[in-house]
Regions:
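Ligand-binding clefts/hinges and TM-proximal coupling segments of bilobed small-molecule sensing domains
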Residues: 43-48, 53-61, 100, 130-176, ...
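Periplasmic-binding protein-like
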Residues: 89-129, 148-167, 186, 261-270
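N-terminal hydrophobic or amphipathic helices and topogenic motifs
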Residues: 2-12, 16-31, 139-208, 213-217
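Bilobed "Venus flytrap"/periplasmic-binding protein-like clamshell domains
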Residues: 27-64, 85-86, 186-189, 199-212, ...
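Extended ligand-binding regions for polar small-molecule ligands
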Residues: 38, 111-152, 204-213, 270-287
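Acidic, polar ligand-binding/catalytic clefts
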Residues: 34-37, 95-106, 116, 208, ...
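Gram-positive cell-envelope targeting signals
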Residues: 1-31, 36, 44, 84, ...
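Extracytoplasmic small-molecule ligand-binding "clamshell" domains
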Residues: 47, 58-65, 70-71, 80, ...
Length: 293
């Protein structure tokens, strides 16, 4: 599958400034920046579901976008950044004075979270995803969003002129059987975002295709990310679609579909002047250095 360069710019677009801090050798200790709610944050803080031990010796600084984390590094507020590999590549391209340590620290897969009582929806969705993988339309969908342009906060500001927005019908609890109600957090382009009063993104297009396949009216409910998974099965919400990483704890609330994106992994961004990771060959090499901070 073609990797998502668009996601990347969604989280980047930062003005670069040369960075003077080369390592964590300061009285304040080591600080690493992450995007809030991402696997990178879980990796640093620790997460039993994903078998992450975390780093009690490192201060995790969370930012609303990866671009802001890199800006903080360039400004000397933090030492490194941990973020998705494709995001990292674009951030480094946008910001002179930075480089990627291209060794995977973690891996994740994205899937949709379906109401446990609706196996028919899960079956139809898995069938749809299999068809899209087989005929190349899933790859084409990812490629379609490569041209997105973003501001510093990750908001789409261009590149989607040829993308048709998706309307959400009004929710009708008296017609639950005739509607597919999707929970999302429409602030994660290219997977989901608002285009005026409409929705757009990879996840949203897959949900529209699923609704059409099932002969249902599509309803999209935009909410805080933390509520997306837990909302499923309540108030007639059928499915969660929000760039969801498959996690054991989430399986308590939903049944996951087959994965539709499995190329994400976390890497380290450091200042160009930093050489302490240059000889690293494996994840263990990097982790040994981080644990010694």
């Amino acid at each position: 599958m073609k990797k998502i360069i668009s996601l990347i710019l969604a989280l980047a677009m930062v003005c670069g400034a040369m960075f003077a801090l080369a390592s964590c050798a300061s009285n304040e200790g080591c600080k690493i920046g992450v995007q809030q709610g991402t696997t990178g944050e879980l990796y640093l803080k620790g997460d039993a579901d994903m078998a992450f031990a975390g780093y009690s010796n490192i201060e995790c600084k969370s930012y609303s976008t990866a671009g802001l984390a890199v800006k903080a590094m360039l400004d000397g507020q933090i030492n490194y950044v941990i973020i998705d590999n494709e995001v990292a590549k674009a951030l480094v391209n946008q910001n002179p004075g930075t480089k990627v340590i291209d060794i995977a620290l973690s891996a994740e897969e994205y899937a949709f979270g379906v109401d446990k009582s609706q196996d028919n929806i899960k079956a139809a969705l898995n069938e749809l995803l299999a068809e899209m993988k087989a005929d190349g339309s899933l790859d084409a969908l990812f490629a379609k969003y490569d041209a997105l342009e973003y501001d510093d906060d990750g908001n789409v500001i261009g590149g989607d002129e040829n993308i048709v927005g998706i309307d959400s019908a009004d929710k009708d609890n008296n017609n639950a059987a005739g509607q597919l109600v999707v929970a999302t957090n429409a602030a994660f382009a290219p997977f989901e975002y608002k285009k005026g009063n409409q929705f757009a993104g990879i996840d949203m297009e897959i949900m529209k295709a699923l609704a059409d396949k099932l002969g249902l009216e599509l309803v999209i409910e935009d909410m805080d990310f933390d509520a997306v998974v837990t909302s499923v099965g309540k108030n007639n919400i059928d499915i969660a679609a929000s760039g969801l990483t498959i996690k054991e704890s989430r399986k308590q609330a939903v049944n996951f579909s087959d994965s539709y994106f499995s190329e994400a992994f976390q890497v380290l961004i450091v200042p160009t002047s930093n050489t302490e990771f240059d000889s690293c060959k494996t994840k263990a090499d990097i982790e040994a250095i981080l644990k010694a901070k």
